[in-house]
Amino acid sequence: MTNRWQRTDMPRGEEYDSRWHTLAEAGENIHGEADLVESLLAESGCTNVLDAGCGTGRVAIELAKRGVGVTGVDADAGMLGTARIKAPEIDWYEADLSDPTGIPNGTFDLILLAGNVMIFLEPGTEDRVLANMASRLTEGGLLVAGFSLRPGQLTCDRYDELTAAAGLAQVARWATWDRIPYTGGDYAVTVVCR
């Protein structure tokens, strides 16, 4: 398994954003992640979010528009550059998610790993990333991750093992960001709690 994000053919910055603009112009809801996060925050009384692997800031910016306190972190300087241009009022940090010193100090009520972050990680760092995320959650805080399930990539069973090892307990698993029950398939959204 190789680090998919390091491939040179991966769209970055504005090119990455153009896909989302096209979908929005076609009438698609491109804010499913923000919709779910907003509802989870309302249900739990949580207030602050870390968008880990935030890319160009699509989800973080939408959450901020909805009044959510949000911080973004990503390892890709180009993607963050686009995010900073679009929303300079949000705190954006360049950091490797497996490095505990790279993420801003403090804890978060909810940490989001959207956009297939888990399958774009450097292979073999998933355990460190999840342990790092767990250490940044408030007691009772939620970690929400959505990623594709394809042969040769991270499975739900392996993800469950890794989150349990990080001291996190599963709360829910859905097939989509709009809470359609997971019954198998090629995508899962999993919520775990500290």
Q: Where do the protein language model's features map onto the residues?
A:
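Class I S-adenosyl-L-methionine
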Residues: 155, 168-194
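Conserved beta-strand signature within the Rossmann-like core of class I S-adenosyl-L-methionine
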Residues: 140-147
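A short SAM/SAH-binding and catalytic strip from SAM-dependent methyltransferases
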Residues: 109-124
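A short acidic, Gly/Pro-enriched loop at the edge of an enzyme's catalytic core
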Residues: 102-110
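Conserved class I S-adenosyl-L-methionine
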Residues: 1-53
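Class I SAM-dependent methyltransferase SAM/SAH-binding core
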Residues: 58-100
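A short glycine-rich, Lys/Arg-flanked "PGG" loop and its adjoining helix->strand segment in the class I
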Residues: 127-139
